[in-house]
């Protein structure tokens, strides 16, 4: 069978707020084109993606989404005409400019890099949804603002790294070079993708990619405390890891939390305030919210205790 005769299918789920990020992340790993929209009448989200029919990984990705979200969504499949689909898809995802410093582009785009920006190149199948997704954009904007604040970060970790885009952005932007970044994900295929993208972006020597469920792996704990932590996952897992994350954060350090909807901000923020972290900035991106939290330096803590 020729490449142009590949059979394609569109897969779709309809889920509530709390399951959106888990299912969208699952689709991103196995589909070339992922989109989502909110049905204002029902309050439910429609998530769909296009993939080669019969390729592996979908069932495993959906099982993980069900486990993470607690929502068992029905999968809806329809045939998709293959002719011209790839070209149409590429046209739908041009270079994404994020903030003042970043440009995200798929490997299907040619031409010189955008002047004055750090270009992050991702394989086309992975790039879809990365630069344009509200959570990813929010994290990149947060990183840009922290660096503009002249915060030097030496020990960085990206939890739930996915494509590795945030780890690569930190490796490219943070001074002094070269900063080492730990990039961890619960899924082996995400870690492999991050490794491949690190090579593509010439930062493989700065990224340490490994499979880990949160803070469980010894190499992650051994490198703590971190002065910058990315956690772009889900609202409830973010709440669940508030204690170990706060314990692994250097006094004076920052954490960038994402993967939560604006409606979940209060719940997540409360969990981290109980661990002594304070809100530095909230960055809304559509329905999504990114939080920058700060751990007070030791001197500030001692001053607060003595004044009490």
Annotate each PLM feature.
Residues 5-114:
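N-terminal auxiliary segments of SAM/dcSAM-dependent transferases
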Residues 65-66, 198, 272:
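Conserved hydrophobic residues forming the short capping helix/wall of the S-adenosyl-L-methionine
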Residues 84-150:
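SAM-dependent Rossmann-like transferase core, predominantly class I methyltransferases
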Residues 126, 130-218, 225:
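Conserved SAM/SAH cofactor-binding pocket of Class I
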Residues 191-192, 238, 265:
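Short alpha-helix immediately C-terminal to the canonical SAM-binding loop
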Residues 229-230:
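Hydrophobic beta-strand segment of the Class I
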Residues 260-308:
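Active-site capping/gating segments
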């Amino acid at each position: 069978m020729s490449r142009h005769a590949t059979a394609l299918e569109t897969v779709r789920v309809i889920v509530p707020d709390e399951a959106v990020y888990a299912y969208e992340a699952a689709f991103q790993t196995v589909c070339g084109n992922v989109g989502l929209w909110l049905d204002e009448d029902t309050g439910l989200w429609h998530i769909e993606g296009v993939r080669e029919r019969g390729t592996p990984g979908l069932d495993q990705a959906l099982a993980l989404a069900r486990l993470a979200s607690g929502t068992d969504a029905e999968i809806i499949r329809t045939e998709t005409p293959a002719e011209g689909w790839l070209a149409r898809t590429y046209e739908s995802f041009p270079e994404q400019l994020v903030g003042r410093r970043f440009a995200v582009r798929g490997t299907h785009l040619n031409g010189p890099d955008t002047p004055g920006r750090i270009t992050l190149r991702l394989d086309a199948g992975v790039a879809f949804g990365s630069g344009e997704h509200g959570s990813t954009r929010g994290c990149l904007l947060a990183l840009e603002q922290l660096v503009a604040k002249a915060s030097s970060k030496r020990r960085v970790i990206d939890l739930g790294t996915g494509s590795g885009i945030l780890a690569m952005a930190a490796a490219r932007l943070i001074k002094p070079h070269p900063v080492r970044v730990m990039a961890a994900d619960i899924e082996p295929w995400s870690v492999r993708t991050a490794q491949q993208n690190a090579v593509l972006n010439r930062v493989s020597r700065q990224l340490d990619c490994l499979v880990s469920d949160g803070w469980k792996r010894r190499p992650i704990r051994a490198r703590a405390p971190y002065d910058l932590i990315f956690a772009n996952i889900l609202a409830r897992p973010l709440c669940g890891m508030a204690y170990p994350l706060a314990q692994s954060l250097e006094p004076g350090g920052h954490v960038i939390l994402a993967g939560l909807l604006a409606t979940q901000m209060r719940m997540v923020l409360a969990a981290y305030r109980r661990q002594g972290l304070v809100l530095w900035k909230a960055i809304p991106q559509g329905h999504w919210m990114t939080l920058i939290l700060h751990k007070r330096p030791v001197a500030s803590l001692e001053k607060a205790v003595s004044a009490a």
